[in-house]
Swiss-Prot record:
The keyword Ligase applies. The keyword Cytoplasm applies. Keywords: Aminoacyl-tRNA synthetase, ATP-binding, Cytoplasm, Ligase, Nucleotide-binding, Protein biosynthesis. This is Arginine--tRNA ligase. GO terms for biological process: arginyl-tRNA aminoacylation. It comes from Desulfosudis oleivorans (strain DSM 6200 / JCM 39069 / Hxd3) (Desulfococcus oleovorans).
Length: 556
């Protein structure tokens, strides 16, 4: 509808110029917005006002010229009005909205899809938590955001590659090994002074007990450095296996788990730094190697190899991001915790230094989650230093509720997550509110089959469709027509919460309609038209939930 109206306005402006009613032939992009108030129409444009300087005319005169030359060959306009200094308000004929129902029934699960990506390849790297402990709630929000962004981009024509970067080569892995070894020594009866910089959680003791049961004799024969490395390897593998299971339970899978250690072992880090040194962006100073990130917009240069010969985490990140583009991705999206915001300029600098546009990298920063129970804060960590895990939250409220709530606000805003609210079977629970629409319509269709012998409603003629004339019905159809734009905007701006917001609006529209009107009536024609409408609602609810990674239950 919006595209049709934009074309009509563009044609009207051109016609007005050709007939001398306007002075310039070029016009800015035509923006159409849905007015806040119903009496301002279905769409409004400020084209006349933003064209005033070019046309050298009063905005209201421009608006009058455009309206006078509107050709409504499709018969979609009920009326137009010029408001205020030059806004043009468009009122769409109610029946002009109805064809969207046919599109939904024809496209089904593809309704709302587009070709925004044009088949280009995009890599979405998300979660990428260190294999030094279980995933916590913050990781869960990042996981939901990253996976939903990937789903939306794939739906909009991108070839999407999901990747988890395993940080298995840094000092944190040695610290993990030392932590486990010290806990193992405690199990063996040794007095141990456990350092504060070691990992404190009870999961470390659990791993130590397992190693003691399976590898005690071998460990007793090892020198300290070998024992640390052994414990680190066993612990990291076990933790990573747990992360994989937790993410699978959260309906998240990856195309690739990329090892940081592989970059070191294959010489990719060393080779990348050598090439950058040849180009002059990596230089030696004070016995260390520095990357001249300040040349690319960072506030200062960064160390990539310390004066003791040890590569920094940033060195691996440079090699990793170069590797991403070497694999042929047109675009790379990283999903990080908000505490990494200061890291963006240096990674952008690395992208520029390896010959890519910094715009080829998008970084999504995900803010923190505060857990609540009936409105009261829940302690996010125990005395032992363990954060509330994603697994614990998923086990308590379910993956669907967790994912929906994680996506219920823009990721750049902190999120309050009420565990009790997420379990309620009431309209106060947003995921229940949306899923119940799907389940209620499924129940309605079952009743239609049992009581009226009406099977799946797949086709309704236009005459029958025009029986949908109640204001709430037309409003519901208008909401359905908004879905493709919600999807394309979510893809364009990498904002999955737009889908969540849309689904809540659609659910509210359906609940309001259902409370006022019976779908299964004594009038067979009206019943068929209304079933056709609610089937479309059911399909769009299912489509939107799928983009969030949330199920659409047939019963609740």
């Amino acid at each position: 509808m919006k595209e049709t109206l934009q074309a009509m306005i563009r044609a009207a402006a051109t016609a007005a110029f050709e007939k001398g009613a306007l002075t310039a032939s070029r016009f800015p992009d035509i923006e159409l917005e849905a007015p806040r108030f119903r009496d301002h129409g279905d769409f409004a444009t400020n084209l006349a006002m933003v064209s005033a300087s070019t046309q050298k005319m009063a905005p209201r005169k421009i608006a009058e010229a455009i309206v006078a030359h509107l050709a409504d060959s499709a018969g979609i306009l009920l009326k137009t009005e010029i408001a205020g200094p030059g806004f043009i308000n468009f009122f769409i004929c109610p029946e002009a909205w109805l064809p969207v129902l046919h599109r939904i029934h024809e496209d089904q699960e593809r309704f709302g899809a587009c070709d925004l990506g044009g088949g280009k390849r995009v890599q979405v790297e998300f979660v990428s938590a260190n294999p030094t402990g279980p995933l916590h709630v913050g990781h869960g929000r990042g996981a939901a955001v990253g996976d939903s962004v990937a789903r939306i981009l794939a739906f909009c024509g991108w070839q999407v590659h999901r990747e988890y970067y395993v940080n298995d080569a840094g000092n944190q892995i040695l610290t993990l090994g030392r932590s486990v070894l010290l806990r193992w020594r405690e199990l063996s009866g040794q007095a141990v002074d456990f350092p504060e910089d070691c990992y404190q959680g009870d999961y470390i003791r659990s791993i130590a007990r397992q190693i003691d049961a399976e590898h005690r004799q071998a460990l007793e024969k090892m020198e300290s450095a070998e024992a640390v490395a052994f414990c680190a390897r066993v612990a990291a593998d076990q933790i990573l296996d747990g992360i994989r299971r937790d993410l699978a339970d959260f309906s998240i899978t990856f195309d690739q788990w990329f090892s940081e250690k592989s970059l070191v072992e294959t010489g990719a880090v060393e080779t990348t730094l050598a090439r950058l040194k040849e180009t002059g962006v990596v230089y030696e100073s004070e016995g260390a190697l520095w990357f001249a990130t300040s040349r690319f917009g960072d506030e200062k240069d960064r160390v990539v190899v310390r004066n003791n010969g040890e590569a920094t985490y940033f060195a691996s990140d440079i090699a990793y991001h170069k590797n991403k583009f070497d694999r042929g991705f047109n675009r790379v999206i990283d999903v990080w915790g908000a505490d990494h915001h200061g890291y963006i300029p240096r990674v952008k600098a690395a992208i520029g230094a390896v010959g890519r546009s910094q715009d080829d990298l998008d970084v999504i920063l995900v803010q923190l989650v505060a857990l609540l129970r009936e409105g009261q804060p829940v302690s996010m960590s125990t005395r032992s230093g363990e954060f509330v895990t994603l697994k614990e939250v998923t086990n308590e409220v379910g993956a669907d509720a967790a994912r929906f709530i994680f996506l219920s606000r823009h990721y750049d805003s902190p999120l309050d997550f009420d565990l009790e609210l997420a379990k309620k079977k009431s309209n106060d629970n947003p995921v229940y509110y949306v899923q119940y629409v799907h389940a209620r319509i499924a129940s309605m269709l079952k009743k239609a089959a049992e009581e009226k012998g009406i099977g799946r409603v797949t086709a309704v003629d236009d005459k029958t469709l025009r029986r949908l004339a109640e204001p709430e019905e037309i409003d519901l159809v208008k909401l359905l027509a908004r879905y493709p734009e919600a999807v394309s905007h979510a893809a364009r701006f990498l904002e999955p919460h737009r889908i969540t917001f849309y689904l809540l609006d659609l659910a509210a529209g359906f609940h309001g309609y259902y409370s006022r009107h019976k779908v299964l009536t004594e009038d067979d024609g009206l019943t068929m038209a209304r079933l056709y409408l609610v089937c479309a609602v059911k399909q769009v609810i299912k489509n939107g939930l799928a983009l969030l990674g949330v199920s659409a239950p047939e019963s609740m």
